[in-house]
UniProtKB/Swiss-Prot annotation:
GO process annotations (BP): flavonoid biosynthetic process; pigmentation; response to auxin; response to karrikin; response to UV; response to UV-B
Residues binding substrate, per UniProt: 50, 115, 192
Family statement: Belongs to the chalcone isomerase family.
Signal peptide range: none
Organism: Gossypium hirsutum (Upland cotton)
A Pfam family this chain is assigned to: Chalcone
General function of this protein: Catalyzes the intramolecular cyclization of bicyclic chalcones into tricyclic (S)-flavanones. Responsible for the isomerization of 4,2',4',6'-tetrahydroxychalcone (also termed chalcone) into naringenin.
Protein name as it appears in the record: Chalcone--flavanone isomerase
Length: 227
């Protein structure tokens, strides 16, 4: 049975993330790995800015399950290495960032770009290719505005290309607005959500709690004795 058949939708604030989706620029149907909000503590109050859903290709379960099967949701949540494996895994991923509060494209792209460049420079891996990819990333967001309920859509191919799309409602367009061929940038977009310093601990926890039982189920059929 495919993973897509065994997962459920998730609600974050007033937004529903369906159990499966066909991302922009993709021919595949991905399943909902997890979802959660991104927010900040401001003057003693937790303000939620965006709801984020992370979708994965079915093959991710077997890919990751080889190493992580048998681990509890808590163990996965606390493992930096686990989320790194999700980010770098050779399977398709899709991220939907839905606005709870309004945001301009410029605000969003500048924040993501600053974080990416700072990390790359600290690791000594910031080259001309990354500089050009960041320029393209900022350009596509330049004239965009995102009212509540609108979404930014990121499709990350197994080869590492990043397709960026936008939606003003719950629909998902067939194609993206731009494709950026830079694996480092593609991975960093997901890393910024679920990595070591990811902006959505809730999405990380959700991902771990939903994938843990799927890992334990994977391979169950192949382990049965042949009749």
């Amino acid at each position: 049975m495919s993973t897509s058949l065994s997962v459920t939708e998730l609600q974050v604030e007033n937004f529903t993330f369906p159990p499966t989706v066909k991302p922009p620029g993709s021919t595949k149907t991905l399943f909902l790995g997890g979802a959660g909000e991104r927010g900040l503590e401001i003057q003693g109050k937790f303000i939620k800015f965006t709801a984020i859903g992370v979708y994965l290709e079915d093959s991710a379960v077997n890919c990751l399950g080889v190493k992580w099967k048998g681990k509890s949701a808590v163990e996965l949540t606390e493992s930096v290495e686990f989320f790194r494996d999700v980010v770098t895994g050779d399977f398709e991923k899709f991220i939907r960032v839905t606005m709870i509060l309004p945001l301009t494209g410029q605000q969003y792209s500048e924040k993501v770009s600053e974080n990416c460049v700072a990390i790359w420079k600290s690791l000594g891996i910031y080259t001309d290719a990354e500089a050009k990819a960041i320029e393209k990333f900022i350009e596509v967001f330049k004239d965009e505005n995102f009212p509540p309920g609108s979404s930014i859509l990121f499709t990350i191919s197994g080869q590492g290309s990043l397709t960026i799309g936008f939606s003003k409602d719950s629909s998902v367009p067939e194609g993206g607005k731009v494709v950026i061929e830079n694996k480092l940038l593609a991975n960093s977009v997901l890393e910024s959500v679920i990595g070591k310093n990811g902006v959505s601990p809730a999405a990380k926890e959700s991902l771990a709690s939903r994938l843990s039982p799927l890992f334990n189920d994977c391979g169950a059929d192949s382990e049965k004795p042949q009749s």
